[in-house]
């Protein structure tokens, strides 16, 4: 697998392997903030949250190289995590039955077998991604940038959206410290009900999260594939389960006129200001100074206990499958931490002078 981006991020291992990890290139002299890293890892774990897998791992980073005394040395940073609470036997009975809408069938054709527990395609692999994103978050914070987000839509239960132009750092910090990050606290009950109802039926629900980045210097990004949207989307789609990314008004723009979609520019208090933010803070692939806003859609967890149609790949016959094991009823819950990590990495990839 080719490394990603200017930091040459690489992730390796698998859900049911003893270890998995990452490598990335970082500047010399960065003091890694253990509290920031631990908080983001803990948010991804989602312990005691309704709809989250019962699999429990320590998720403690093991530093192999590239850091000494908590400070980066300038050499390649390599960090690993141990896996201990995995159960390959849960997949023995379905080793030749591809789970619908999972990686199993294309992986079987490409690699010659169905990877246990999803292998490197598993949501478990968001752990090293979240670690990398936490490091990226620190580098962005040093440059005055803040990233945060909230659950926007869980199974059709909606939270209030961010105001397109009036998002503040305090709100983003509050959301990051919440055990259930929503802007409207009354949305939590409805969201948890949707998750619980699906879980009782052996089913799952999809969801979306809304993300915001503040403080990006105007011009961050570039043309074509060097654009800010290109960078963010490319790493966002590396998060397992992500099926859609839209910036600003996104797909709603297809129903707009230019006179409605365009963000007027004015002078306010001696500074450039925008009358709206349908572009999500990005024009021409570059940050324009408004809040960078995007929404990320997660598919419903494909591993469900309801009987489904599949095929037996060894016998080439139609079959039915019931997926056991331990799985999230809504991957968007833990996916928020992974999406924030991807946003941090996508922005960092566009920063010059690292």
Language-model features and meaning:
Residues 1-354:
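Generic N-terminal targeting/processing segments that precede catalytic cores or assembly contacts
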């Amino acid at each position: 697998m080719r490394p990603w981006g200017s930091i040459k991020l690489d992730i390796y291992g698998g859900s049911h392997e003893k270890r998995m990890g990452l490598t990335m290139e970082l500047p010399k002299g960065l003091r890694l903030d253990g509290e920031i890293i631990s908080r983001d890892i803990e948010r991804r774990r989602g312990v005691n949250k309704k709809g989250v897998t019962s699999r429990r791992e320590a998720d403690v980073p093991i530093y192999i190289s590239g850091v000494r005394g908590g400070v980066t040395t300038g050499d390649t940073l390599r960090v690993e995590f141990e896996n201990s609470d995995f159960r390959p036997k849960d997949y023995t009975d379905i080793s030749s039955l591809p789970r619908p809408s999972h990686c199993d069938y294309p992986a079987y054709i490409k690699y010659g077998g169905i990877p246990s527990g999803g292998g490197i395609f598993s949501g478990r692999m968001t752990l090293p991604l979240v670690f990398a994103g936490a490091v990226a978050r620190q580098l962005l914070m040093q440059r005055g940038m803040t990233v945060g987000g909230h659950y926007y839509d869980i199974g059709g239960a909606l939270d209030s959206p961010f105001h397109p132009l009036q998002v503040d750092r305090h709100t983003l910090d509050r959301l990051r410290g919440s055990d259930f990050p929503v802007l409207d606290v009354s949305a939590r009950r409805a969201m948890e009900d949707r998750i619980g109802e699906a879980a009782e039926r052996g089913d799952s629900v999809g969801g979306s999260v809304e993300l915001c980045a503040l403080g990006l210097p105007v011009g961050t990004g570039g043309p074509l594939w060097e654009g800010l949207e290109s960078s963010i989307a490319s790493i966002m789609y590396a998060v397992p389960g992500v099926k859609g990314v839209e910036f600003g008004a996104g797909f709603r723009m297809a129903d707009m006129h230019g006179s409605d979609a365009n963000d007027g520019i004015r002078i306010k208090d001696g500074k450039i200001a925008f009358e709206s933010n349908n572009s999500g803070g990005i024009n021409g692939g570059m940050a324009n100074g408004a809040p960078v806003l995007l929404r990320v859609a997660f598919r419903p967890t494909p591993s469900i206990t309801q009987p489904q149609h599949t095929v037996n790949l060894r016998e080439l016959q139609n079959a039915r499958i019931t997926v056991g094991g331990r799985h999230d009823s809504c991957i968007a819950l833990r996916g928020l931490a992974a999406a924030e990590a991807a946003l941090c990495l996508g922005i960092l990839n566009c920063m010059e002078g690292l």
